[in-house]
Amino acid sequence: MMATKEEISMVGFALVAYAGDARTAAVHALDAAEAGDFDKANELVEKAQQDINEAHNQQTQLLSQEAGGAEMDVTFIMVHGQDTLMTTMLLIDETRYMIRMFKRIKELENKQ
């Protein structure tokens, strides 16, 4: 069985959409953390994680099909989707780290 280019492209579009939403939430989480609103930052990074999980689920479906022997034609939108997924996963990891950094900086500033 072969996944059609259209099916692969649709998964690519889904990856871009979910990962794009996740990226937006992660950037807003950084903004909230910088402003000292750590509850909002954590809420937004969790939303980013949920969105990236949806993107990852889309990716996993195609990977499972390919592992099962389905032939895949790579489309440019799929490459873009994969790129967006991976860079956003990294951004979410870094956002979690930076929220902790901003919180620590705020704690140190409050000690002065």
Curated annotation (Swiss-Prot):
Active site annotation, chain numbering: H80
Subunit architecture: Homotrimer.
Keyword list, A-Z: Cytoplasm, Magnesium, Metal-binding, Phosphoprotein, Phosphotransferase system, Sugar transport, Transferase, Transport
Keyword flag tRNA-binding: no
NCBIfam families in UniProt: EIIA-LAC (TIGR00823)
Positions with a binding annotation for Mg(2+): D83
Entry comment, domain topic: The PTS EIIA type-3 domain is phosphorylated by phospho-HPr on a histidyl residue. Then, it transfers the phosphoryl group to the PTS EIIB type-3 domain.
Identification of the protein by name: PTS system lactose-specific EIIA component
PANTHER family: PHOSPHOTRANSFERASE SYSTEM SUGAR-SPECIFIC EII COMPONENT, PTS SYSTEM N,N'-DIACETYLCHITOBIOSE-SPECIFIC EIIA COMPONENT
A Pfam cross-reference name: PTS_IIA
Cofactor(s) named in the record: Mg(2+)
Main location: cytoplasm
Record text on cofactor binding: Binds 1 Mg(2+) ion per trimer.
InterPro entries: PTS_IIA_lac/cel, PTS_IIA_lac/cel_sf
SUPFAM superfamilies on file: Enzyme IIa from lactose specific PTS, IIa-lac
GO MF, one example: metal ion binding
Gene: lacF
Residue ranges of every copy of the PTS EIIA type-3 domain listed in the record: 6-104
Subcellular locations according to the entry: Cytoplasm
